[in-house]
């Protein structure tokens, strides 16, 4: 009986792993390229967003709560960066996530964003603004 229960639990676990949609493979926590922030990517309905869940500066100073002081909207400058959505509106199509926006709190800048899951499991972030493109590689945590 114990073996049967163990077998059923194992099969259920393996089924869940295989059942994960390709579009959901980016869901999880990612460390940004300069290792200063962890971003949790999550799904709401059919779009993906990413919020800041860890800021390296807070390790040495737990009382520090960085604010969005460079936001172009003065009414948002007092909001905390921790917990803030910095990636919004990502839509999955043909192995990539596109049509989203990324916000850089340190610069107070919004830009177009695309995401691509690389074969090594890293996440390629492609940011475009005014004809310029920058790429970052994030690592899953």
What are the functions of these language-model segments?
Residues 1-22:
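Bacterial Sec-dependent N-terminal signal peptides
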Residues 18-29, 133:
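N-terminal helix-cap/turn-to-beta initiation motif at the start of protein domains
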Residues 20-24, 69-73, 94-97:
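Short Pro/Gly-enriched beta-strand edge/turn motifs at strand-loop
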Residues 43-47, 93-96, 116-123:
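Short, solvent-exposed coil/turn segments at beta-strand boundaries
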Residues 105-107, 112-116, 122-134:
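Short, exposed beta-strand-loop hairpins at the edges of beta-sheets
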């Amino acid at each position: 009986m114990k073996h049967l229960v163990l077998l059923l639990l194992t099969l259920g676990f393996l089924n869940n792993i295989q059942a994960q949609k390709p579009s959901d493979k980016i869901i999880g926590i990612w460390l940004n390229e300069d290792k200063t922030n962890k971003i949790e990517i999550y799904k709401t309905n059919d779009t993906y967003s990413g919020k800041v869940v860890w800021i390296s500066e807070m390790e040495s100073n737990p009382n520090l709560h960085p604010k969005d002081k460079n936001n172009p909207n003065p009414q948002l400058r007092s909001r905390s960066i921790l917990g803030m959505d910095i990636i919004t509106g990502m839509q999955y199509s043909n192995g990539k996530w596109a049509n989203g926006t990324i916000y850089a709190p340190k610069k107070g800048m919004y830009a177009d964003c695309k995401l691509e899951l690389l074969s090594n499991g890293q996440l390629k972030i492609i940011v475009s603004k005014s004809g310029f493109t920058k790429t970052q590689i994030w690592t899953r945590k």
